[in-house]
């Protein structure tokens, strides 16, 4: 076992971390293990996890049932190519998904990661329109402050101004961007919010293959919660103009918003849905792009006679076995009560921050709590303050947010929010 200082030194010299400089002086912590909602550092400190490892670890860490699923599958096969083969884990996972997905979504294409699932969905939309003879439909529409991943076409539908990919703006495919829906979740609807989309489709609808949205909750683009009615109105317009509707549920899927899928808040089914992150309970990378039988058959009736995509690790049996067990574990748990409990606690415990002059807004939905600051936080000084308080929270930009594992207990959640408040108080008031 490598000692902490040697590990950190080698890491600093050779390993590149996400969204970081190779010469970064940002704080870096060596993790020894993780159990439940607790992360244990190599120096012995223990942190309550407020991030679910970026939305993924619904059941916490080191869960005995997920460990057993992994061990059982490892004894059979860890991987086999999916071209010309199928296997129990893929079929079992697909059976579970078909039972819980919004109505009509029954053709499942397994992919590697969330970003790749978005790429796959966009390729599906282009191939579908091409197969219908609508070869001029090469563009996509989306709303501002969205985030859909870090691969090429996924970046093209992230906000080009406020997003993380503005450096590539002049190289990426040019898409159509609409204003962020200006009606927050649970506020009364006004049709003015959908008018920009209606205007765009009236003028440019015959150029657009699909509209892609993060339903209800915008994730890394701003952690904004908007009215589900927008989705209902958007779907009607898409149908009117022959445009596919893609829902990116990579962050919101599997209960995070209080519904199994955020689309359920609107009571509708998209034409294509992307899932990932929590699909395997945070154990391995796996995603899926799911569509309808009609769309799949149309794609396969086109020029290529098939869908033109095939990842090496598609439907990896180890990942599929863990994902199937994660879904069973979720459905057998009182997950809805847990989400309601977490949402209620987050609203109550974070509310004092709304009175601070450095805070713009505090909001919570499901197991998501957001403190939006008036200016960007200093990660270099704020993250160590969280660690000193025994909590793991990783803010970005103006957003300090938590999305804890669903299994977090009341006392752990209180320690998480108290640590968050204390760290912010130290950062901004002392």
From Swiss-Prot:
Subcellular location per the Swiss-Prot or TrEMBL entry: Cytoplasm
Q: Where does pyridoxal 5'-phosphate bind?
A: 114-115, 248, 311-312
Which pathway?
A: Cofactor biosynthesis; biotin biosynthesis; 7,8-diaminononanoate from 8-amino-7-oxononanoate (SAM route): step 1/1
What organism is recorded for this protein? Answer: Haemophilus influenzae (strain ATCC 51907 / DSM 11121 / KW20 / Rd)
Q: Which residues get modified to N6-(pyridoxal phosphate)lysine?
A: 277
Q: Which GO terms describe its molecular function?
A: adenosylmethionine-8-amino-7-oxononanoate transaminase activity; pyridoxal phosphate binding
Site note Participates in the substrate recognition with KAPA and in a stacking interaction with the adenine ring of SAM, residues: 19
Q: What does this protein do?
A: Catalyzes the transfer of the alpha-amino group from S-adenosyl-L-methionine (SAM) to 7-keto-8-aminopelargonic acid (KAPA) to form 7,8-diaminopelargonic acid (DAPA). It is the only aminotransferase known to utilize SAM as an amino donor.
**Keywords carried by this UniProt record:** Aminotransferase, Biotin biosynthesis, Cytoplasm, Pyridoxal phosphate, S-adenosyl-L-methionine, Transferase
Q: Residues that bind substrate, according to the entry?
A: 54, 147, 277, 310, 394
Query: What subunit structure does UniProt give?
Result: Homodimer.
- Provide the protein name: Adenosylmethionine-8-amino-7-oxononanoate aminotransferase
GO CC terms? cytoplasm
Listed SUPFAM superfamilies? PLP-dependent transferases
What EC numbers are recorded for this enzyme?
Answer: 2.6.1.62
Q: Which GO terms describe its biological process?
A: biotin biosynthetic process
Q: Which family does it belong to?
A: Belongs to the class-III pyridoxal-phosphate-dependent aminotransferase family. BioA subfamily.
The cofactor named in the record is: pyridoxal 5'-phosphate
Q: Which reaction does it catalyse?
A: (8S)-8-amino-7-oxononanoate + S-adenosyl-L-methionine = S-adenosyl-4-methylsulfanyl-2-oxobutanoate + (7R,8S)-7,8-diammoniononanoate
The keyword Lyase is assigned to this record: no
């Amino acid at each position: 076992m490598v000692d902490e200082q040697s590990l950190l030194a080698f890491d600093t010299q050779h390993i590149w971390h996400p969204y970081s400089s190779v010469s970064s002086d940002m704080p870096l912590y060596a993790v020894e293990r993780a159990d439940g909602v607790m992360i244990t550092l190599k120096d012995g400190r223990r942190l309550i996890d407020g991030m679910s490892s970026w939305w993924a670890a619904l059941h916490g860490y080191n869960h005995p049932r997920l460990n057993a699923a992994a061990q059982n599958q490892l004894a059979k096969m860890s991987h086999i190519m999916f071209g010309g083969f199928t296997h129990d884990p893929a079929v079992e996972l697909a059976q579970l998904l078909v039972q819980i997905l919004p109505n009509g979504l029954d053709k499942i294409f397994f992919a590697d990661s969330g970003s790749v699932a978005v790429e796959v969905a966009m390729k599906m939309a282009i191939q579908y329109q091409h197969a219908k003879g609508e070869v001029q439909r090469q563009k996509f529409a989306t709303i501002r402050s969205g985030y859909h991943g870090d691969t090429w076409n996924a970046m093209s539908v992230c906000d080009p101004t406020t997003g993380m990919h503005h450096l590539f703006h002049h190289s990426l495919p040019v898409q159509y961007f609409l204003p962020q829906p200006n009606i927050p979740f649970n506020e009364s609807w006004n049709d003015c919010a959908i008018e920009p989309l209606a205007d765009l489709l009236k003028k440019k609808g015959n150029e657009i293959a699909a509209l892609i949205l993060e339903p209800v909750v915008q994730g890394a683009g701003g952690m904004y919660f908007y009215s589900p009615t927008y989705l209902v109105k958007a779907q009607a317009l898409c149908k009117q103009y022959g445009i596919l509707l893609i829902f990116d549920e990579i962050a919101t899927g599997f209960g995070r918003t209080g519904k199994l899928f955020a689309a359920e808040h609107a009571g509708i089914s998209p034409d294509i849905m992307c899932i990932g992150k929590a699909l395997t309970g945070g154990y391995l990378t796996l995603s899926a792009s799911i569509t309808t039988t009609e769309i799949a058959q149309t794609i396969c009736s086109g020029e290529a006679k098939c869908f033109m995509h095939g990842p090496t690790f598609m439907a990896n049996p180890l990942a599929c076995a863990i994902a199937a067990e994660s879904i069973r574990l979720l459905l057998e748990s009182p997950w809805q009560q847990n989400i309601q409990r977490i949402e209620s606690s987050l609203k109550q415990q974070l509310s004092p921050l709304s009175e601070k002059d450095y805070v713009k807004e505090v909001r919570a939905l499901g197991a998501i709590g957001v403190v939006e600051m008036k200016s960007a936080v200093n990660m270099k000084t704020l993250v160590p303050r969280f660690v000193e308080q025994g909590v793991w929270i990783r803010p970005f930009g103006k957003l300090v947010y938590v999305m804890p594992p669903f299994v977090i207990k009341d006392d752990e959640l209180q320690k998480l929010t108290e640590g968050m408040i204390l760290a912010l108080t130290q950062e901004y008031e002392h």
